[in-house]
């Protein structure tokens, strides 16, 4: 089963990915934790290019192509092999993030992203996507509290409002794949919401 965790900056995706992994492992499941961009040594180098602040402005198309280049490597080396052996893959961001950040935030066309998605992924799509939603100002405050901001975190409020709306639109359009969680709540409340989803996730994993 392929589960992705999505959401804007400061939504707690990594923390909750680790929590969900622990809960699934308690049930004896083989769980692979990974992230995007990244997940392999080569893809992590691409991640550094994407996130590191630079004096050179990165063109939006360059950003998009780098994201999918890293994804192609990640799929080949980690995600597809893990799914083939029957593992549960938990990935912090995947292609929904591309539609949200490069589509919503950068304004690139959905058609262009979809063409690359088909080329790189074929028919592979997540089985379940958890979207951790919260107001932009809350997420940015959390990101700032972590320390130095990366290249994306330095974007303004309007960028992240567009990112958030893109996520919400995708979740509304395909409710059978997405579960929307209120990430503005205290962590314990978010994790109780994850616990409520566990029976359904376990049933699908074992189905």
UniProtKB/Swiss-Prot annotation:
GO terms for cellular component: cytosol. InterPro entries: P-loop_NTPase, Thymidylate_kin-like_dom, Thymidylate_kinase. The keyword NADP does not apply. One of its GO terms (molecular function) is ATP binding. Keywords: ATP-binding, Kinase, Nucleotide biosynthesis, Nucleotide-binding, Transferase. It comes from the Bacteria. It catalyses: dTMP + ATP = dTDP + ADP. Coiled coil: none annotated. GO terms for biological process: dTDP biosynthetic process; dTTP biosynthetic process; dUDP biosynthetic process. Its EC number is 2.7.4.9. Belongs to the thymidylate kinase family. This is Thymidylate kinase. The lineage of its organism: Bacteria, Pseudomonadati, Pseudomonadota, Gammaproteobacteria, Pseudomonadales.
């Amino acid at each position: 089963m392929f589960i992705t965790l999505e959401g804007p900056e400061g939504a707690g995706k990594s923390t909750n990915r680790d929590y969900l992994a622990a809960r699934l492992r308690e049930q004896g499941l083989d769980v692979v934790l990974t992230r995007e961009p990244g997940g392999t040594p080569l893809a992590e180098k691409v991640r550094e290019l994407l996130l590191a602040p630079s004096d050179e402005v990165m063109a939006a198309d360059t950003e998009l192509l780098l994201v999918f280049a890293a994804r192609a490597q990640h799929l080949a080396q980690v995600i597809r092999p893990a799914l083939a052996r029957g593992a549960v893959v938990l990935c912090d961001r995947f292609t929904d993030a591309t539609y949200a950040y490069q589509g919503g935030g950068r304004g690139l066309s959905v058609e262009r992203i979809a063409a690359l998605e088909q080329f790189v992924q074929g028919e592979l799509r997540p089985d379940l996507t958890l979207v951790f939603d919260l107001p932009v100002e809350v997420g940015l405050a959390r990101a700032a509290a972590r320390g130095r901001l990366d290249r994306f975190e330095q974007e303004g409020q309007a960028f992240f409002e567009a990112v958030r709306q893109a996520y919400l639109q995708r979740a509304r359009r395909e409710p059978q794949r997405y579960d929307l969680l209120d990430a503005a709540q205290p962590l314990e409340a978010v994790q109780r919401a994850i616990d409520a989803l566990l029976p359904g996730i376990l049933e699908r994993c074992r189905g």
